[in-house]
């Protein structure tokens, strides 16, 4: 599965801690992330992560394009509630995930449910509906 990681500044440390906790599960999948989030997670976990531009420089749009091309299977975007309303990136990523039926977590509680589902194989339907070449 292809997993995208994104986090607002005040949630980056939470994303790092989440990825440390679930490194064993994440290691079996391909991960991409916006630049700073991905660098922090890679440094803390040793996981190989494809880095896109920072969100402010267009990284959100790069991940959004991969969602639109059905190249992302799961999105973890830890949102700061104080930034949520003004964040066009959150709204666009959430809209694309809804449009293309991509599981999306905007907080750690939902991310834990999705990551456990990933571990159990609950998301394997993505491989059937959208087979990778």
What is each model feature region?
Residues 28-37:
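Short internal beta-strands
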Residues 30, 47-57, 126-128:
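Short hydrophobic/aromatic-enriched beta-strand-loop microsegments
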Residues 32, 94-114:
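Short, acidic/small-residue loops that bind anionic groups at enzyme active sites
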Residues 53-60, 81, 110:
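Short, acidic/turn-prone active-site loops that include or flank metal/cofactor-
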Residues 60-99:
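Mid-chain, well-packed structural core segment of small domains
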Residues 109-133:
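Short, glycine-/small-residue-rich phosphate/pyrophosphate-handling segment
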């Amino acid at each position: 599965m292809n997993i995208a990681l994104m986090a607002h500044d005040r949630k980056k440390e939470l994303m790092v801690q989440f990825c440390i906790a679930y490194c064993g599960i994440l290691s079996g999948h391909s991960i991409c992330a916006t630049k700073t989030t991905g660098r922090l997670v890679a440094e803390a976990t040793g996981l190989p992560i494809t880095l896109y531009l920072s969100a402010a420089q267009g990284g959100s749009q790069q991940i959004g394009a991969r969602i639109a091309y059905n190249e992302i299977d799961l999105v973890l975007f830890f949102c700061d509630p104080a930034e949520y309303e003004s964040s066009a990136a959150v709204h666009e990523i959430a809209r694309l995930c809804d449009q293309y039926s991509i599981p999306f977590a905007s907080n750690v509680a939902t991310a834990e449910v999705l990551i456990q589902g990933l571990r159990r194989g609950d998301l394997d339907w993505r491989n059937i509906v959208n087979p990778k070449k």
